[in-house]
Amino acid sequence: MWFHRRLGEILYAGCGVSRSEAGLRRALEEVRALREEFWADVKVVGGQARLNQELERALRVADFLELAEVMILDALDRRESAGAHFREEYATQGGEAQRNDEAWCSVSAWQTGPDGGHTRRSEPLSFSLVPMQVRDYR
């Protein structure tokens, strides 16, 4: 399906491992526009007499579009670099990830409200046996 492929291109360009605020904002706009286009143009063939794989695929793409938006919002909200989330604005002078454990040592969950808006909820993590430390891969 074209929408699925286009969504992958948007995410690869704007929300890959190396991310910037400008790229994330552009990706968010593109995903929202793609979702509007999807719902305006989606056509599902088949009937209800048996399993409709076209409907299943369309619903899966709809889920991917929503997940992509939340993933981008989360990356925008997270003002640090850590692991597979590298924000170009949050790097050391040597190009290494600049973590912010005080603010981001947590588990986040996003909730979609009745108006379609998204809210992040977070729960702090605690490490009692192993101290947190920055890993050096050099």
Residue ranges with predicted function:
Residues 1-138:
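Glycine- and aromatic-enriched mobile tails/lids
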